[in-house]
Amino acid sequence: MELRTASSPRDVKTYDTARLREEFLIQDLFRPDEVKMVYSHIDRIITGAAMPVNKALTLAAGEELRAEYFLQRREMGIINIGGEGKVTVDGTVYTLRHRDGIYVGRGCKDVVMESVDSAKPAKFYFNSTPAHKAYPTVYIRPEDCVNVELGSLEQSNHRNICKYIPVSYTHLTLPTN
């Protein structure tokens, strides 16, 4: 797991493009048959990716988290941006098609990711944050997401935000698959 320390807001103002990229850009997230994670001391967030091609990949805590298992004190959201894949959470299998997501709550011990077809591997992008309460695992389809349109064309900042895991989702019971 790569570690990133916080930067002083005052110092960041003096960074040139190369330094900004060095401090904040995450590259090469999707590596065949690997889980890559970057831990940022800013908000203690972990950004990561898993691209299982020829084998299933298990999410491990690593010594950086000082935990018995990855979600012992954390929660996470996973979105599949590749081919069809499966995420197994404590023995329950969830099939994630392209753009499907899953919220996995604190306390889940085993998270395993695999591709259905190695010629079209799943690409699981995820974020994980500290959690203080356990919520159930929730399977999320793109049509379940909350879409928010922001900005304007006139201001050159028009965009659509697709919220896979708004706060209310952790309290809902959505389809399990």
Model-derived features: positions:
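Short acidic-glycine-tyrosine-enriched beta hairpin
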Residues: 91-106
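Conserved small/polar residues in nucleotide/adenosyl-binding loops
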Residues: 170-176
